[in-house]
């Protein structure tokens, strides 16, 4: 027997285009596409479909950050309530909290000073803090003259998550 009789690919290549078309039709009929648990599979093989990155609104982020300041871990009913109130899924809230805890622990491991990990603040981290230029991301707080005490919750990041009533309170500058 010749090799082309055993290989359907060679056989369709050597035969007429009509035979190749028939072969193509056969494979299309045999292919099955299954989407299950976020995975797409052709004939049992395939890769996971990545869900698009969730974009949170500023209101959602404010509520999530505020809740994270209260507690780093949510019980199931708390998570369900928070998700429902923000129009998010419980999974989105769960993943956000996981990511936030991870980021928080990473910052603590780096010495609780987030400026050390910021390349724009590299030289400032080595010297005492001076009231030179405010960090780029702190424009709103510095424009309002709000200053956070250095030993507040989440050192160096508290002003990112301040609630609206905190912005109206003036705090004495700590030197």
Curated annotation (Swiss-Prot):
Belongs to the distal-less homeobox family. GO terms for biological process: anatomical structure formation involved in morphogenesis; cell differentiation; embryonic limb morphogenesis; embryonic skeletal system development; epithelial cell differentiation; head development; inner ear morphogenesis; nervous system development. GO terms for molecular function: DNA-binding transcription factor activity; DNA-binding transcription factor activity, RNA polymerase II-specific; RNA polymerase II cis-regulatory region sequence-specific DNA binding; sequence-specific double-stranded DNA binding. It is found in: Nucleus. One of its GO terms (cellular component) is nucleus. Residues 49-108 bind DNA. Residues 1-20 have a biased composition (Polar residues). PROSITE patterns: HOMEOBOX_1, HOMEOBOX_2. Residues 1-32, 109-131 are annotated as: Disordered. Keywords: Developmental protein, DNA-binding, Homeobox, Nucleus. Pfam families: Homeodomain. It comes from Homo sapiens (Human). It comes from the Eukaryota. This is Homeobox protein DLX-6.
